[in-house]
Amino acid sequence: MGVFTFEDESTSTIAPARLYKALVKDADAIIPKAVEAIQSIETVEGNGGPGTIKKLTLIEGGETKYVLHKIEAVDEANLGYNYSIVGGVGLPDTIEKISFETKLVEGANGGSIGKVTIKIETKGDAQPNEEEGKAAKARGDAFFKAIENYLSAHPEYN
C-alpha cells in the first residue's frame, strides 16, 4: 500500500464562518441545492459526528451513482472538517481510501481560503492515476465554487 499526499487551496468571497456552516453544519440541505449533480445526502450510520457515514447520491453521465463519505473529525472552533471517501464511484478499484483534511481561514476582504490536504491510500503497489487526480481536483474546485455561488445568490442564509 502506498500513501500519496497532495495539497490545494481555493479562495472565496464568502466569510469563513458562513462558508463552514454551509459546507459542514447544513451540508445535507445546502449541497443538493447548490451542486446540480448531487441529488441527495443521507446519513447511513452515526449521529453526524466522527464515524458517521453519509451516502451522497449523484447523477453522473446520465447515471445515478453514489459515494460513501465517512466523517473523521469536526473542529468547529478552528473551522476544520476531515472526511474520507470509503466507497462508491469516488473510489477507483486501485484505491483503498481517499482522505481529506480541510480547514477554512480568513482570506482577503472578509473572504475565505479553503485549504485541503488529500491523502490517497492505494491498494498493493498501485500508483494514483494522474488523470484521476486532475479530475478529482476539478470536481473539488467546481464543488467549492458551486457552494460559493449558492451563498452569494442567497444572502439571507446565515
Swiss-Prot record:
Trans-zeatin 3 binds at residues 69, 81. It is an enzyme of class 3 (hydrolase). It is found in: Cytoplasm, Cytosol. Trans-zeatin 2 binds at residue 60. GO terms for cellular component: cytosol; nucleus. Its EC number is 3.1.27.-. Ca(2+) binds at residues 32, 35, 38. GO terms for biological process: abscisic acid-activated signaling pathway; defense response. Coiled coil: none annotated. Gene3D superfamilies: 3.30.530.20. CDD domains: Bet_v1-like. InterPro entries: Bet_v_I/MLP, Bet_v_I_allergen, Plant_def-hormone_signal, START-like_dom_sf. It holds the Pfam family Bet_v_1. The keyword Transferase does not apply. Trans-zeatin 1 binds at residues 8, 83. One of its GO terms (molecular function) is abscisic acid binding. Keywords: Allergen, Calcium, Cytoplasm, Hydrolase, Metal-binding, Nuclease, Pathogenesis-related protein, Plant defense. SUPFAM superfamilies: Bet v1-like. Class II ribonuclease (RNase). Binds to cytokinins. Interacts with melatonin. Belongs to the BetVI family. This is Class 10 plant pathogenesis-related protein 2D. It comes from Lupinus luteus (European yellow lupine). The gene is PR10.2D.
